Design a protein with these regions (language model features):
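Radical SAM [4Fe-4S] cluster-binding motif and immediate context
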Residues: 24, 186-363, 507-518, 581
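Glycine-rich beta-alpha loop elements in corrinoid/cobalamin-binding modules
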Residues: 35, 39-176, 401, 405
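Short, electropositive alpha-helical surface patch
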Residues: 58-65, 282-288, 375-392
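Conserved C-terminal portion of the radical SAM core fold
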Residues: 38, 76-78, 106, 250, ...
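Glycine- and acidic-residue-enriched helix-capping/strand-helix junction motifs
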Residues: 14-29
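C-terminal accessory regions of radical SAM enzymes
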Residues: 4-15, 158-161, 165-172, 204-205, ...
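Residues that mark the start of a beta-strand
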Residues: 2-3, 42, 213-216, 499
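Short, intrinsically disordered terminal segments enriched in charged and Pro/Gly residues
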Residues: 597-616
Length: 616
């Protein structure tokens, strides 16, 4: 049997085109591809990404799916993704029904796991797989080949019986995770992604190498914790934590390194390290493999404060090539952390950051605001912690989201904050909820402004580029050609440790005036968040410049003291052309100022008005 597996289109509902690196490729598809191929069947992959030659994402997806169906004539089509992929999956199923109405569709992934009855009944694929799908997809293929319809014999399967949805018995006693075949990325064009689109990955996954080739690996499944915002809630059938043996992980790393010659390894696990002993075991094995095979790559991982990683363990990790590790800090308020069921303390975060700074390892902190316990006081606590510890580290700031499968989602349903599921899924990646104790007029302007400033302001230390020239050897980069950018070779001395760094970045040409057009990310996103605050349709936010200016004046007229917490994000200096990266030696966050034209008066005007009116 021939099976076509279709990846979701990255940021399908947010803006086309959005270039997509292999670090965003869902590994679940690669595991499914491997299981199907190892059972003796053919696998064809379709990766509808990184093709900007269409008017819209839908037009691109329509053409790609239509061509693939005509060329490959599959016997079964597999779709999957997360809740944010709802619109893509809905459109993909409609296209398949139009072009190949007799070909069965099976849907899997997080989107089906946590709201199975609604998603299956709404999107109406022929089958759905709940939970891990490697064995189930093979059993389904065997059943389809036999011509039988004894679907009740297959656990964790959804199907249709006389027009009604039916779901078989549940069995989540999975096989030993070490017995899983390694993922097969080849059907999805990963080699081309490494060659052409590695620069599309976020900077924290590529800054250590001028020619980055990042690769991902998953060494465990599930999570032993049960944070309220996580899809693995306390009573979830899918949260059981299972980790692979270090020996098994090393075997996959060797296979990937020999095949793809990566130089940055991203360990994607929600929780790679549950205790420091496992990290030590991994580091010792990695050091041995480095010496034995001549490996040369940097790596990054995620852990939890309760893993109790100490100075000696992180020192060993650095020796083994680790350049950064991640905590989901979320909040520095004990009250909010308790409400989130994080089981962690701000003192643990501070200790970890201090150790990382001492050793010269990067620290990536994720903050999410908007928990049900969030108040003005808790925001002040978190922003005070941010100001003290986080100005020189990698950070992300976001609003908390009630994703299906989380306790927050259940709470929002009960409270009526989510009253129309179809509308919720349609705008799942475009909406922010107010679950806090704050009034809407304060919460929405504050969180949008916080996210905006954290992305575009120069609050980290800055340094001037000492060298900036065109890289003539990489003038045909696909991303550069589309955006009319140029690949530059850049040198800069770190403002923290004074060491010289060498980067390659896609930038606007020096010969062109450095002016942001109406399509610039900075001003489009700024106008977008203003229109969202006003509750207007985002599609119409360019209709009136006067309206935007008026909304901006309305926003900054808020003199609520909460806005003063944004001071650390504003930075000390005027905005100049720069890019955000990290030092390749001490791994602290830095901004590299560029010798380009500086016509950024619009952004500086915004910044000045914010500082004057909000008085920060």
């Amino acid at each position: 049997m021939k099976v076509l597996l279709i990846l979701p289109t990255f940021r399908y509902n947010q803006g086309y085109p959005s270039f997509y690196s292999n670090t965003d490729l869902p590994t679940g598809f690669a595991y499914i591809a491997s299981a199907i191929r190892n059972s003796g069947h053919d696998v064809v992959g379709l990766n509808p990404n990184n093709d900007p030659g269409y008017k819209s994402a839908y037009e691109m997806v329509y053409d790609k799916i239509s061509q693939s169906l005509l060329k490959n004539k599959p016997d079964l089509i597999g779709l999957g993704g997360l809740s944010v992929d709802f619109k893509f999956i809905k459109d993909a199923i409609q296209i398949i029904r139009e072009k190949a109405p007799e070909t069965p569709i099976v849907l899997g992934g997080g989107i089906i796991n946590y709201d199975v009855e609604f998603i299956f009944s709404t999107l109406r694929p022929d089958f759905c797989i709940v939970g891990e799908g490697e064995e189930i997809i093979v059993d389904l293929i065997k059943m389809l080949e036999s011509g039988k319809q004894d679907y009740e014999e297959i656990a964790n399967l959804g199907y249709w019986d006389n027009g009604a949805p039916k779901f078989t018995k549940q069995n989540f006693n999975y096989i030993d995770i070490d017995k899983r075949a390694f993922p097969d990325y080849e059907p999805f064009g990963i080699s081309a992604m490494l060659d052409e689109f590695s620069m599309a990955t976020r900077y924290v996954y590529r800054y250590t190498r001028p020619n980055p080739r990042p690769m991902t690996i998953v060494s465990s499944r599930g999570c032993p914790y049960s944070c309220t915002f996580c899809i693995h809630k306390k009573d979830s059938k899918y949260r059981k934590y299972r980790s692979r043996s270090i020996e098994n992980i090393m075997q996959e790393i060797k296979e990937l390194y020999d095949k793809y010659h990566f130089n940055i390894l991203i360990i994607l696990d929600e929780l790679f390290v549950v205790n420091k002993e496992r990290l030590r075991e991994f580091c010792l094995a990695l050091i041995d493999a480095h010496n034995k095979f001549g490996w040369d790559f940097d790596w990054i991982f995620q852990t939890h404060p309760n893993a109790s990683i100490d100075y000696e363990t992180l020192e060993m990790a650095k020796k083994a090539g680790c350049y950064c590790f991640t905590y989901g800090i979320e909040s520095a308020s004990p009250r909010v952390l308790a409400s989130m069921n994080k089981k962690s303390k701000p003192s643990q975060f501070a200790t970890a950051i201090n150790i990382a700074n001492t050793l010269g390892i990067g620290f990536y902190a994720n903050f999410i605001f908007g928990d049900v316990a969030e108040t003005e006081e808790t925001i002040h606590e978190t922003m005070s912690f941010f100001s003290q510890y986080c100005l020189d580290i990698h950070i992300s700031i976001a609003a908390i989201s009630p994703y299906p499968g989380s306790k927050l989602f259940d709470d929002c349903l009960k409270k009526g904050l989510i009253s129309d599921k179809m509308k919720y899924y349609k705008y799942i990646d475009k909406q922010i909820f107010n679950m806090t104790k704050l009034p809407n007029r304060v919460w929405f302007p504050w969180i949008y402004l916080a996210m905006y400033l954290s992305k575009y302001c120069q609050f980290a230390k800055s340094t001037n580029a000492t060298y900036c020239e065109v890289d003539t050897e990489d003038s045909n980069n696909a991303i550069a050609l589309y955006y009319k950018n140029t690949m530059y070779k850049i040198k800069a001395n770190c403002p923290h440790c004074s060491q010289e760094n060498y980067y390659r970045e896609l930038l606007r040409s020096k010969e062109e005036p450095f002016v942001y057009s109406k399509n610039s990310n900075i001003f489009v996103s700024f106008e977008a968040f203003l229109m969202r605050i006003a509750g207007l349709n985002i599609i119409r936010y360019n209709i009136s410049k006067l309206m935007v200016k008026g909304l901006f004046l309305l926003l900054i007229s808020f003199k609520h003291p909460l806005f003063k917490t944004l001071k650390p994000l504003m930075g000390e200096n005027e905005f100049v052309p720069f890019f955000t990266t990290c030092c390749q030696h001490c791994n602290k966050r830095i901004n590299v100022n560029l010798p380009m034209g500086n016509n950024n008066h619009r952004f500086n005007t915004i910044r000045k008005l914010l500082k004057i009116v909000i008085k920060i």
